[in-house]
Amino acid sequence: MLSAGIVGLPNVGKSTLFSAITNLQVEIANYPFATIEPNAGIVNVIDERLDKLASLIKPDKVTHTTFRFVDIAGLVKGASKGEGLGNQFLANIREVDLICHVVRCYEDKKIVHVNNQVDPVFDFEIIVNELIQADIEVVNTRIGKIKRKAESGDKQSKEEYQLLAPVLQGLQQNQMVLHLVNEVDLKKLKSLNLLTAKPILVVANVSEADLSNLDHNPHLTQLNQFLKQHNLPHAIPVCALLENELSSLDANGRQDWLKELGLSDYQGLNQLIKTAYDAIGLWSFFTFGKQEVRAWAFKKGWLAPQCAGEIHTDFERGFIKVEVISWNQLYELKSLQEAKKQGLVRLRGQGLRDARWWCVSL
């Protein structure tokens, strides 16, 4: 299962956020390194399309697709050199597919900040710099192994060296690998498992009071300006403390409480989970029947047989054709039989690619 790692400096709200995401009470304390071993949790990816299909079909069971989050203990400056148990933390980050940077965007004198000041840009740069330094070491080591072969004329080593040399130069100028190479070259670098080649999301941990008017949070404004300058998506505003309190409620209870607080439009964790799911390259297709309506995750670019293999390996091996219909057409017509009458149910073969939001009757 693909996963996202939650990283950040100590005491920015990482573990509180993780607790809310998974509704799992992990160790939370107001001091650095309260979390040493990474905690992992599986979350549902809420999809309104699936819920609408379920309301139409009324199955015995509704199953959302899932996604894995990992809470990785707090990094500090010097982690790439092993400071603050940094080697262990960096090793944990290597195991995830997406990095969620949590930065603090609220003032609270009761909660000690590791740098004694609230500066989300500075916090973000510290973490990224540690990841860059770790990548420099990996690339340097690899270049050292292939340079002699490349200079002697070995074609494969020469091509790899020509790819790595500018990457190393860019890293030394504090640029992330993500912004140094195209998608084709990024795949060639996959075996090195470079940290700054992973997709990045930034989570701005704000106070509950800020949620009603985020434009008036100077820390968030500063952070988003910085991210825009560096071709990174805007931060996702989340109040980790509020989310932790809401996590014990069902969807209706959550919405009622937010409405009472005047925060009906607040998406918070749902936005984070959906954005992470998409950023990691995952899409969904749906299966439906009276017993179950279910969402299935698949990687962008997959063909129909690979998607079928998510349901059962036999389906992938024996795949020939499948009847599909788009979810919105099925929902609008309220009936699979009516959709067939109108010729909207299509028979597709092995060449069907990226079956996003297609529905398959089981």
From Swiss-Prot:
Show the GO cellular component annotation of the record.
cytoplasm
Residues given in the record as Mg(2+) binding sites = S15, T35
CDD domains hit by this protein: YchF (cd01900)
Tell me the PROSITE patterns matching this sequence. Answer: G_OBG (PS51710), TGS (PS51880)
UniProt binding sites for ATP: N11, V12, G13, K14, S15, T16
What highest taxon heads this organism's lineage?
Bacteria
User: Which keywords annotate this record?
Assistant: ATP-binding, Magnesium, Metal-binding, Nucleotide-binding
Looking at the record, the residues that make up the OBG-type G domain are 2-258
- So which cofactors does this thing need? Mg(2+)
What terms describe the molecular function in GO for this protein? ATP binding; ATP hydrolysis activity; GTP binding; metal ion binding; ribosomal large subunit binding
As for family, the record states: Belongs to the TRAFAC class OBG-HflX-like GTPase superfamily. OBG GTPase family. YchF/OLA1 subfamily.
Chain's role? ATPase that binds to both the 70S ribosome and the 50S ribosomal subunit in a nucleotide-independent manner.
Protein's recorded name: Ribosome-binding ATPase YchF
Annotated source species: Mycoplasma pneumoniae (strain ATCC 29342 / M129 / Subtype 1)
The gene behind this protein is ychF
